């Protein structure tokens, strides 16, 4: 039994350690309180994206636009504490974060503009704008990690 446990642990470490060592994302160090605040913001961003998708799935694009602007758009920055967080971020990370907030505001505009287009074209506009938001999230998580 001990041999099997040891063998399983050895295989796990053999597989896991290289994966951890290959993490080439830039480490961003900040005080624990700020890191926790940033992580909470990112979790809220994910909840917001989920809410936007739920509203779109219900056919309530106007609510999705309002949610995007009020919780992720440029008008939401004060609520996120962006002013005191930005100086702690490397410039590239800060730029990606700003692009997320701009993309959310553009999404809200795209939803309203889509109402003036044929349904299929309007849907493509909305999904393209939504993808800009998720692309910003993916770019940041692919390039940076917090400590």
Give the role of each language-model region.
Residues 17-21:
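Sec/Tat signal peptide C-region and signal peptidase I cleavage site
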Residues 7-16:
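Bacterial N-terminal signal peptides
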Residues 1-4:
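Positively charged n-region of N-terminal signal peptides that target proteins for export
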Residues 24-147:
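Sequence context surrounding c-type heme c attachment/ligation sites in exported
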């Amino acid at each position: 039994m001990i041999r099997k446990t040891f063998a399983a642990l050895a295989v796990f470490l053999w597989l896991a350690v290289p994966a951890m060592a290959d993490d080439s994302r830039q480490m961003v160090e900040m005080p624990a309180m700020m890191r926790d605040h940033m992580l909470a913001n990112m979790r809220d961003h994910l909840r917001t994206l989920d809410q936007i998708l739920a509203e779109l799935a219900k056919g309530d694009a106007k609510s999705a636009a309002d949610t995007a602007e009020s919780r992720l758009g440029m008008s939401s920055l004060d609520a996120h504490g962006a002013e005191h967080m930005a100086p702690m971020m490397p410039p590239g990370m800060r730029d990606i974060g700003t692009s997320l907030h701009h993309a959310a505001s553009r999404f809200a505009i795209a939803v309203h503009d889509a109402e003036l287009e044929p349904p299929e074209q309007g849907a493509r506009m909305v999904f393209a704008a939504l993808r800009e938001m998720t692309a910003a999230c993916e770019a940041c998580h692919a390039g940076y990690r917090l400590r």
